[in-house]
Amino acid sequence: MQEISFEIVELEAQTYHPLVRAEFPGLEHCWWVIDSGASKSVFDVSLTSHYVLDENDAVMATGLGKEVVETRSGTIAELKIGDFNFGPLRIALVDFGHINSEYAKFSNKKIVGLIGCDFLYSHSAILDFRHKRIELKK
């Protein structure tokens, strides 16, 4: 079991978002939102050097919150969260411009992705809000 600390950002009165730090070559101080309400993990499409598009990728329109956004699919070869590396992760790719605009109002954190239930389920995640940590099986 891997234990990883997370931070909680309050984006308006009583709307809390747990964030874990991510590392990618050439990117400092980037964060993933732990989003157990998201069925699939999502990554910022603008970070092209950090993923490979699926060969049979098709542009799809998907509801993300109230908005309809273009979605593509791809794979991140390596995902480093905290001090731990997790193998390849299939991801949906969307433009995170609007997400980072909202976060900029309340925080200086750059969001690069949402960790969804696909990842949380496959790693038997346990979120401990009291101690601000997530436990993951590798």
Short names for language-model regions:
Residues M1-K138:
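Pepsin/retropepsin-fold aspartyl endopeptidases
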